[in-house]
């Protein structure tokens, strides 16, 4: 089989399964997973003691992430949400308020436990990002997927250097997936990604670089 025919066959396969691929991308590169991965990688790489950072993350990530996620799953089971990504803007306010309240309580707990500053900085940034997106959601639907992957990609490149630029390819990939699934318009994805990129810059230049 020639290279050209292989490319055509692959393109046809993708075209015939594009919705399934978009759904898979949305699940794998979801805000929950992206947030955990970027926090773990940067905290372990740039923390003073990688083992200590890993220990803190093993404690804090389940405490911070699991209760809101289980709450969303419960709302889906109860028929109040279509899925955990809250596609209907009118149903987002209550879950987002609960998530904001929970993360705020976790920040108080993190401060009380005297967790490393870089770990606290990441969770504080997550709180601020969700807060900004929640305020926008009061008036207009915006892409949390786009904001999260854009913030993570920006922070990664700023911390790791130019070799990490390919990470930014995930931003349009996630954007395409959300648009293909008709969960967002291109404008909603664009502005979500823009807010995420700004938060990534603030996270790195405003917090992390001052802690290293």
Residue ranges and their predicted role:
Residues 1-22:
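Short, Lys/Arg-rich, polar N-terminal cytosolic tail immediately upstream
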Residues 48-52, 80-90, 112-117, 183-187:
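Membrane-interface helix-boundary motifs at transmembrane edges
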Residues 52-67, 125, 155:
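Alpha-helical transmembrane segments
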Residues 116-212:
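Membrane-embedded catalytic cores of phosphoryl/pyrophosphoryl-handling enzymes
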Residues 22-25, 82-99:
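Juxtamembrane helix-capping/reentrant segments at transmembrane boundaries
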Residues 2, 68-79:
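Membrane-water interface of transmembrane alpha-helices
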Residues 34-36, 97-108, 147-150, 195:
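Core segments of transmembrane alpha-helices
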Residues 25-46:
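The first (N-terminal) embedded transmembrane alpha-helix
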